[in-house]
Swiss-Prot record:
Protein name: Alanine--tRNA ligase
Cited NCBIfam families: alaS
EC assignment: 6.1.1.7
Species for this entry: Listeria monocytogenes serotype 4b (strain F2365)
Gene Ontology biological process terms from the UniProt entry: alanyl-tRNA aminoacylation
Gene field: alaS
GO molecular function, one term: alanine-tRNA ligase activity
Described function: Catalyzes the attachment of alanine to tRNA(Ala) in a two-step reaction: alanine is first activated by ATP to form Ala-AMP and then transferred to the acceptor end of tRNA(Ala). Also edits incorrectly charged Ser-tRNA(Ala) and Gly-tRNA(Ala) via its editing domain.
UniProt keyword annotations, A-Z: Aminoacyl-tRNA synthetase, ATP-binding, Cytoplasm, Ligase, Metal-binding, Nucleotide-binding, Protein biosynthesis, RNA-binding, tRNA-binding, Zinc
Cofactor note: Binds 1 zinc ion per subunit.
């Protein structure tokens, strides 16, 4: 067997399939582009769904890729097994209606066994097949020459993820030999069983059926091939590594952790788990941040935060007690740089994000320790012997506190932990995550009609909004028709069209179609599978027929406003990078006639000063009257110019470059103004955060910007009129009013305090004594909870002692507060427990600390009864 590095294995795979006529697709970013069904790109096929369901026809039906992927459905096993990972690479080859089972099997066998490529011993290879897939069995037996004892039938070998393409699959296994298992009585010791001897290295999926919505299976119009080979597993075999972690993909990271920790790998199982967790998780986090994800409390950001915190917790096993994960980023970048330069190119930014998150987590751990101390203290004060599962889970989930650490502290205080309760909380979280998580979601049922419409249609709308053309196809209800009449809708493909199809964030053009016999409106334009512009129309008059000569007219006003917003979007993109940093990447956009919306990655908030600067930069470029130059050129030449490419987009060899002078250079297929002066004016309407590490700016240009400014000016004039001042002096007038209001509030609070003090004399007079404990339980007049707290403060100041419960009616609600003196707490009384009982008797709930609690109720009529219960409760405590 050859000795190969991981980079060499990856490159050999891609070179092999390139030699076999495949287009090598670039690895897509981990954050899905226009696919809300998944949190992460989690396989090679996840980026190919549009080809498999026929919604897009690829230029070459043969494709291959090395796709970085993230899966997080089994995080707790990472580090504890030989091959669980959250980040991994999937090597795959794909055929869309080209070669099928024979081609896939022959290619796989040649790559694995030929001395030119991997050069495995054929006797070491086994395959599994679906029992009913006689064709695959025959090919393995007769075409490849495998003996029957190397072909294993397994019922699960059928790939089906719901509606859409599905079919049998065939997996290839490598026999690592008796050293990894030779117990003949082991029922799992076979290719496809749970064992370490037979490692699955490649899965060949034969998509030959449509899984229909009614549950039936019908043959696909075009059969497809989808294969997946895990690079980490493949490399572990080639490098003769016991687990994936001893390969050159992980060991440099582990060696760096050894240096930081001063602890050696391979001497302790507990330590080795920590090394593996750290090595796995830093790869995931570094690549995910590089691709635009950021730690947060939701979605993919929550997963990153969880992985970072898990790694930091395991680092404590290695006596690492300070931020360190950020130091591993350059190592990850160096390992992967030959194929994935993005981590090395963004090392500083990725390190900054990780270090900030680590520092916050170390602070959070300290907060968690303070919370735990409170929990332990409360448990002792209330004579509880067990720390509740809900408390353990909160410490674990919110503060990253390991259960074992909580247990150690509990034991030090003579307490036990509720493991069953904790596991129940964990199960609930897993169930929530499972319901929210999506793997490769089902695709659309593969269609045939549009995929078979191959006659080309040219877009001629860059320089013209009117054009005379010919109707090539008319489609109604997924059927080709000869004509469509007034009152009906249809889809149309023309020989040439000036109508822009929605793409790159720019909305589709609208307009009219006129023939000698009919009139129709264009409502929408999208790309058909074979890249023609597909127009959705509604026929208003007469009849349109296939072959008709028609006059196509784009709505010029809407197009004019749209292109202003599109060029302004390019200016804004460049201005964001200049103002906030080069880490800013486009995460989505909308360019319509009335506004533009731009989503982008950014770690942190944007200040008012930065927004002002952005507006100034864009408007300066507008007023400089810069010519917009658009040309097509080879992609290599565009890159030399420094052209910005959209993150996650795929480009051909020839690209369209939009240059706004030397200021902004982007690859773009959209329509633009000829000169920035055409934009007129640019105004930012809003800036918000829309998710973890993603911000959104909405803006307007031209007439809409003028309208926006006018509305703002009118609002200011109205405010000035109400304040009886000028627009210029309005801010000072508002400041004066705010100062006056603060003074009134201070006087009001002082008055309320005096009233509460005066009322306290009556409220606190003659408290009831029950078994030597002073008890006050009364209804009072208090406008809110703040005033009730003032009564409690007065009670404390007067050092009355004992137990206080006060209730006040506020509209249809009840406010309740209770307080217990230090002596009463020592005697076993608890304000929170008392108030919970009182609140339930007037339709509410609540609780709090032993010394003070507050609650609310929904039944004012029962407040008197609830307060009467206080005496009963005190007597019950004394019984």
């Amino acid at each position: 067997m050859k000795q190969l590095s991981s980079a060499e294995v990856r490159q050999l795979f891609l070179d092999f399939f390139k030699e076999k006529g495949h287009t090598i697709e670039p690895s897509a970013p981990l954050v899905p582009n226009n696919d809300p069904t998944i949190l992460w790109i989690n396989s090679g096929v996840a980026t190919m769904k549009k080809y498999f369901d026929g919604s897009v026809i690829p230029d070459n039906p043969r494709m291959a890729n090395a796709q970085k992927s993230i899966r997080t459905n089994d995080i707790e096993n990472v580090g504890k097994t030989a091959r669980h990972h959250t980040f991994f690479e999937m090597l795959g080859n794909f055929s869309i209606g080209d070669y099928f089972k024979e081609g896939a099997i022959v290619f796989a066998w040649e790559f694995l066994t030929s001395p030119k490529w991997i050069g495995f011993d054929p006797d070491k290879l086994y395959v599994t097949v679906y029992p009913e897939d006689e064709e695959a069995k025959t090919l393995w037996r007769e075409k490849i020459g495998l003996s029957d004892d190397h072909i294993v039938e397994i019922e699960d070998n059928f790939w089906d993820i719901g509606i859409g393409p599905s079919g049998p699959d065939s997996e290839i296994f490598y026999d690592r030999g008796p050293a990894f298992g030779d117990d003949a009585s082991d029922p799992e010791l076979y290719p496809g069983g749970e064992n370490e001897r037979y490692l699955e290295i490649w899965n060949l999926v034969f998509s030959q059926f449509n899984h229909n919505p009614d549950g039936t299976y019908t043959p696909l119009p075009k059969q497809n091939i989808d294969t997946g080979m895990g690079l980490e597993r493949m490399v572990s075999i080639i490098q003769d590594a016991p687990t994936n972690f001893e390969t050159d993909l992980f060991m440099p990271i582990i060696r760096e952790v050894e240096q930081i920790a001063g602890v050696k790998y391979g001497h302790s199982q507990e330590n080795d788990v920590a090394f593996k967790v750290i090595a796995d998780h830093i790869r995931t986090v570094a690549f995910a941040i590089g691709d635009g994800a950021l730690p947060s409390n939701e979605g993919r950001g929550y997963i990153l935060r969880r992985l970072l915190r898990r790694a930091v917790r395991y680092a404590k096993v290695l006596t690492i007690n300070e931020p360190f994960m950020y130091k591993l980023v350059p190592v990850v970048g160096k390992i992967m740089n030959s194929f994935y330069p993005e981590v090395e190119n963004q090392t500083d930014f990725i390190q900054k994000v990780i270090r900030t998150e680590e520092e916050r987590f170390h602070e959070t751990l300290n907060e968690g320790l303070a919370i735990l101390e409170t929990i332990l203290k409360t448990a002792k004060e209330t004579n509880e012997q067990i720390i509740k599962g809900a408390d353990i889970f909160k410490l674990y989930d919110t503060f990253g506190f390991p259960v074992e650490l909580t247990e150690e502290y509990a034991e030090d205080h003579g307490l036990k932990v509720d493991h069953a309760g904790f596991e129940a909380e964990m199960k609930e979280q897993r169930d929530r995550a499972r319901s929210a998580r999506a793997d490769v979601k089902s695709m659309q049922v593969q269609g045939e009609l549009l995929a078979n419409l191959t006659e080309k249609s040219a877009f001629v709308g860059y320089n013209s909004t009117e054009h005379v053309s010919e109707i090539l196809y008319l489609i109604q209800d997924d059927t080709l028709v000869e004509e469509v009449a007034a009152g009906s809708e249809a889809q149309v493909i023309f020989k040439e069209t000036p109508f822009y199809a929605e793409s790159g964030g720019q909305v589709a053009d609208k307009g009219t179609i006129e023939s000698e016999t009919g009139l129709a409106y264009v409502e929408d334009v999208q790309k058909a599978p074979n890249k023609q512009n597909l127009h959705r129309i509604s026929v208003k008059e007469g009849v349109l027929k296939t072959g008709d000569t028609v006059k196509l007219a784009v709505d010029k006003v809407k197009r004019r406003e749209t292109i202003k917003n599109h060029t302004a979007t390019h200016l804004l993109h460049r201005a964001l990078k200049d103002t906030l940093g080069e880490h800013v990447n486009q995460a989505g956009s909308l360019v319509s006639p009335d506004r533009l919306r731009f989503d982008f990655s950014h770690f942190g908030q944007i200040t008012e000063e930065e927004l002002t600067k952005l507006e100034e930069i864009v408007n300066e470029k507008i007023w400089e009257q810069i010519n917009v130059v658009i040309e097509e050129m080879p992609i290599a030449e565009a890159k030399e110019l420094g052209a910005m490419a959209l993150f996650g987009e795929k480009y051909g060899d020839i690209v369209r470059v939009v240059q706004v002078g030397k200021y902004s250079i982007e690859l773009c297929g959209g329509v633009h103004v000829r000169n920035t002066a055409d934009i007129g004016l640019f105004k930012i309407v809003s800036e918000t955060g829309i998710g973890a590490g993603t911000r959104r700016i909405e803006a307007v240009t031209g007439k809409e910007a003028y309208r926006f400014v006018t509305e703002q000016e009118n609002t200011l004039k109205q405010a000035a009129s109400l304040l009886k001042t000028t627009t210029k002096e309005t801010p000072q007038k508002v400041e004066q009013l705010q100062a006056d209001l603060r003074e009134v509030k201070r006087e009001n609070e002082s008055l309320l305090s005096k009233l509460a003090s005066a009322a306290s004399a009556d409220i606190f007079e003659s408290p009831e004594e029950i078994g030597g404990v002073k008890v006050i339980a009364k209804q009072v007049n208090a406008k809110d909870m703040n005033q009730l707290r003032q009564f409690v403060d007065n009670w404390k100041d007067k050092k009355i002692g004992g137990i206080l419960v006060l209730g006040a009616v506020q509209g249809d609600k009840v406010n309740l507060i209770s307080a217990v003196s230090e002596e009463a707490i020592k005697a076993g009384y608890h304000a929170g427990k008392l108030l919970k009982e009182v609140a339930t008797r007037c339709g509410g709930n609540g609780g709090g600390r032993p010394d003070m609690a507050q609650a609310g109720g929904k039944n004012p009529a029962e407040l008197g009864t609830a307060l009467d219960y206080v005496s009963t409760w005190v007597k019950e405590q004394q019984a």
